């Protein structure tokens, strides 16, 4: 199995949904985490990145997924709950790195562990202690 699978509804890249303060799920997450518009987000906020889904609400407190290959579809390990959303970006692509595009337009290759150090939302607390499983 590969992280480049082809289910109809999955993504190859996913949006940082903390930048979508008009989305249908806005009431499911703390309002103070969202940016009101891209222009108010600092340059180091990720806008999108390699992902197994079209979007996510990553947080520095999320757990490291046990599956970095994207095999979680249909077996209960798909990262679709609070505390697990970073797993949509945490993949074995590009030598355990993820291509991330930031709100100012620049791109970077970020290590899987480095995802936990990014400022995904306004109240995010980076986690330098995350480890690969």
Predicted features, each with a name:
Residues 1-133:
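Short, well-structured segments within or immediately adjacent to enzyme catalytic domains
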């Amino acid at each position: 199995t590969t992280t480049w699978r082809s289910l109809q509804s999955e993504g190859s890249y996913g949006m940082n949904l903390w930048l979508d303060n008009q989305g249908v799920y806005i009431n499911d997450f703390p309002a103070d985490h969202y940016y009101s518009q891209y222009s108010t987000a600092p340059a180091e906020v990720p806008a999108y990145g390699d992902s197994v889904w079209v979007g996510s609400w990553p947080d520095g407190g999320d757990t490291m997924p046990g599956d970095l290959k994207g095999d979680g579809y249909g077996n209960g390990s798909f990262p679709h709950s609070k505390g697990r959303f970073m797993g949509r970006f945490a993949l074995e692509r590009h030598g355990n790195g993820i291509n991330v595009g930031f709100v100012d337009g620049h791109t970077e290759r970020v290590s899987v562990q480095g995802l936990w150090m990014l400022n995904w939302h306004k109240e995010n607390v980076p986690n330098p202690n995350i480890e690969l499983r």
